[in-house]
UniProtKB/Swiss-Prot annotation:
Name of the featured protein: F-box only protein 4
Functional pathway: Protein modification; protein ubiquitination
Taxonomic lineage of the native organism: Eukaryota, Metazoa, Chordata, Craniata, Vertebrata
Keyword Cytoplasm in annotation: yes
The keyword Ion transport appears for this protein: no
Subcellular location: Cytoplasm
Amino acid sequence: MAGSEPRGAGSPPPASDWGRLEAAILSGWRTFWYSVAKERATPTASRKEAAEETSALTRLPVDVQLYILSFLSPHDLCQLGSTDHYWNKTIRDPILWRYFLLRDLPSWSSVDWKSLPDLEILKKPISEVTDSTCLDYMEVYKMCCPYTRRALKASRPMYGVVTSFLHSLIIQNEPRFAMFGPGLEELNTSLVLSLMSSEDLCPTAGLPHRQIDGIGSGVNFQLNNQQKFNILILYSTTRKERDRAREEHTSTVNKMFSLQSEGDEQQGSRYSVIPQIQKVCEVVDGFIYVANAEAHRRHEWQDEFSRIMAMTDPAFGSSGRPMLVLSCISQADVKRMPCFYLAHELHLSLLNHPWMVQDTEAETLTGFLNGIEWILEEVESKRAK
C-alpha cells in the first residue's frame, strides 16, 4: 500500500503553477470520470453495486467529487480503491499520481537501484499522461515510495531472517567497507569525527592482523550492540591540504587515483586506483561513497562517476558488491539536493551492482544507521548465496 513521507519545508509552487496543475488534474479526472460513467449506465448485477452507485459521494456534481478526491493522500486513495471495483479503477488517474510523484520525490530520504524512477516518465507532457496507453504512475509511485519499500522489507519471510542469522554465526570476520568521497573532506562538519564520537556505534581501532600497508586497519563499529563492521576511511590527500582547500573553497588533487585519459564535456576522465587503494578494493565487502549534497556546491559529476567506477571495478574483488551513497550535508539547516536528483547526476543507474542513496547529516548522523543497516543486509544476502 502506498503512502507518503512528510514533505520538506520547501515553499509551494507559485499560484499560477498551482492553478495550471489543479486544472490539469480536474480535466484528467473529468475525462476519466465520464468514460467510467458510461459503464455505470448499464444495469448492475447485484443490489450491492446498485447501492454503491447511489452513495452520497457519487451523487455529488462531478467537479465537486474531483475536488474532494484531489485532497486525499496516496495512502487514502489506496484505501478508497480497495473498497470496490469502481473506486479501484477511478483512483488510478495518471495525472493525479504523476502529481504525487513530482511532489513527494524531493522529500524522500532514500532511493535505491530498484526504485529510482526514469527521468523520462517525469518529463512527459500532460497530453501524453492522459493517453490510455500511458504508464501506470500509481505503480511507479508505490515502487519508489520509501514507505512501500519498508513495508515489503518487513514482510520478508521468517525463514530468510533465520537463515541470515545462522549464516552470520559462521562468519569469522566482520563485514569491511571502504569509505571515500568528497563529502568526507568538503563539509564544515566532519562526518568521521561524528562517527568516532558516537556512543551508539562504539568505535574502536581495527585489529592489527587486518592492517593494510599504507592504509591501516580501519575502525571497528557495532550496530545496535550486535552487528560489527569495519570501515577503512580513505582520504584523497593529506589533512593539511584538505583543510586549506576547504578554507579557500578550492579543489585538491586526488592522490587515490591516477589519470588514464582526459575527458571532455560529454565524457569524464578515466581513472584507475593506485596500488595501495587497489589492495583495499580487493578485501572489502562493499563501498560507502560520501557525496557532498549541499545545494550550493559545484560538482564534477562525470569525474565523480569515473572514480566510483574505478573503485568498484570487479577486477579488484568479487562482482556485485553493494555501494551505499551517503547524500551528506553538514547540519539540518543546510539546503540539500534531493537524493533522487543526486542519484541521476552520479549516473548510478549505470552501475552493475546494488546501491542505495541515503540522506545523511554529518553533525547528528541522521540517516547513517539506516544506510548501514541496508549495506549490512546486502552483504549478508550475498554471503548466504
